[in-house]
């Protein structure tokens, strides 16, 4: 009994000692981060300078962008958002300084590496363009870029049009029983369309979402996996939580994501076995793999197929949902767009890319939607190089994380007049006088520099075709339950969106 008491006293003493050490360490880190840290000259809330907890809390709640907007409104162009992370909204200078090509004043500087917290290698161990180092990224981009050139997109248009026609016909079918009127969830319909398009371009066959009018199981896995990214981020910044990882991460979801990559690899092999020359991604990737010394391994092709499937679908669908909502909340803009589209095309069959590419108001509407509701709304962190770097006139020491907070930059009056108004006219060439001082280069929704989005041409093509055919075919009205749709969207690195209930009425000609 005495031995037990002695051991109990020892255990209590050790536990108490550990608690005291933890409190002392926490106190030391708090004083250091607030008073002596190398980022102490960067403005921001005191609590953000000493702890990751506030930032992690917003990450878990899905309120990062709202918080970023508030911080920049209060503290200015540059804000310390965590003990080792700094956010910028001075996009005109910060984008080139952080993400740009190393030319001109930056000649001789290395590209800043990505914040490794956000870029975890696929389960097969082979990095895609997203995680690759500079050398491997350049090698992979030389191979993959052929699938996204303007010439390639022009050849892919008939395939894209096939699925857009399925979308329009499906919506007509969904409203047929009510004399051409009905209410649908456009978030689901846009997701089905963009995922079917990207799957056919990648694998030679769609997911079948538009055919089945349901979300394929691996599309559902992808959409759910966005929510787990925030948890991985928090676990990375609080290492002691990794011992409780199973309590925070749904291991079934982790396994499903591994199964998804395995399924993608199988689909890639099936597509390669067909040996067809249709103008899809795989034809162009395989035709150029090995040219000029740039060659991807089979596993790298699989990893990049997984990336393209994800990046080339959900973000496009997000923008389509957003622009639909914004048009319906801004009747003046909708009427002007409707007039341009319906006067330009006498028939549905005439709606083709060569003509769509000349339509200035359609283009301005999409640019304004990308500014107002960027599909990737957060900052993509980069690690400052050895010796430190000047970013937008501020010196940042090596090892700290820097980024441009996209949503906050695009909704700042420092960059745009009436930033919370949906005004496509700000993108007109020549500029509208009222918006002549807008810093349009502060908006880079497809990112910037050597790591800029590879699929920009395809995204613009899909957006133009889908939006034009929707506006030509239907009159749209926002249902009461979706009047606050945008405010109910949350950011889990990408947007997590609720139902967008829209009443459609087929246009009779």
Curated annotation (Swiss-Prot):
Q: Which GO terms describe its molecular function?
A: heme binding; iron ion binding; monooxygenase activity; oxidoreductase activity, acting on paired donors, with incorporation or reduction of molecular oxygen
The UniProt entry lists the main location of this chain as membrane
Keyword entries, A-Z: Heme, Iron, Membrane, Metal-binding, Monooxygenase, Oxidoreductase, Transmembrane, Transmembrane helix
At which positions is heme bound? 453
Q: Which GO terms fall under biological process for this protein?
A: mycotoxin biosynthetic process
Give a single Pfam family match: p450
What role does it play? Answer: Cytochrome P450 monooxygenase; part of the tra gene cluster that produces terrestric acid. The clavatol biosynthesis cluster cla and the terrestric acid cluster tra are both involved in the production of peniphenones and penilactones. The non-reducing PKS claF is responsible for the formation of clavatol from successive condensations of 3 malonyl-CoA units, presumably with a simple acetyl-CoA starter unit, and 2 methylation steps. The esterase claE probably collaborates with claF by catalyzing the hydrolysis of ACP-bound acyl intermediates to free the ACP from stalled intermediates.
Q: What is this protein called?
A: Cytochrome P450 monooxygenase traB
Natural source organism: Penicillium crustosum
